[in-house]
Amino acid sequence: MCALVPPLFPNFGWPSTGEYDSYYLAGDILNNGGFLDFPVPEETYGAVTAVTQHQNSFGVSVSSEGNEIDNNPVVVKKLNHNASERDRRRKINSLFSSLRSCLPASGQSKKLSIPATVSRSLKYIPELQEQVKKLIKKKEELLVQISGQRNTECYVKQPPKAVANYISTVSATRLGDNEVMVQISSSKIHNFSISNVLSGLEEDRFVLVDMSSSRSQGERLFYTLHLQVEKIENYKLNCEELSQRMLYLYEECGNSYI
């Protein structure tokens, strides 16, 4: 019954030479140094030798060329020029970067090119000049205010010495924060000048709004002055000090009668 089963690998009628002979044959061929050992033509060896010699000669020529560059003054001068040019451009870029940082914040939002930086700077210079003019004007106004305040403090801190010797009388009444009504009474036999009072008040930054004068039967003169003073920070109008100041201007500084 088993004889009827065909063999797994039929030999097709060829005689068997052994179970593993073919494998040994293949191993011997692979281990043999002559496997794929085809003869190489002599022209191939010559070409390889020529390429090797050419590479060696090329390396020598490159090295010699480098030495020639180092010893060539024209090449050295050109290299130095290129280095100087790079340094010059680096400095210029640094200067334009500094100029760009001086522009307003709107001009620093993005990196401007060199022409754009120059154009924006030329437009910004007149703006700065206008701001400088405004600041100078504001400074002058502040100096005028400070000077007026000092003048006011001067006569407030230096009242007349001989108040009791004055012949005339002065009374001041406040009408508002910067308004006052002043009445002067004096004898007409004394040659006092009201113009000196007005000049002194003008120096003290008082403005004369209205003025009137009258004469009584008792040979006395009366002057009524309505004054305004410019508003100065931290300055409070003192009627008593103003009265003393006007007495000083009216009697001690008077030269003629008007």
Curated annotation (Swiss-Prot):
GO molecular function per UniProt: DNA binding; DNA-binding transcription factor activity; protein dimerization activity
A UniProt-annotated Pfam family: HLH
Taxonomic superkingdom: Eukaryota
Subcellular location: Nucleus
Entry keywords, A to Z: DNA-binding, Nucleus, Transcription, Transcription regulation
Tissue: Expressed in vascular tissues. Detected in roots.
Gene3D superfamilies named in the record: Helix-loop-helix DNA-binding domain
Domain bHLH intervals: 76-128
Subunit and partners: Homodimer.
Name of the protein in its database record: Transcription factor ORG3
Organism whose genome encodes this protein: Arabidopsis thaliana
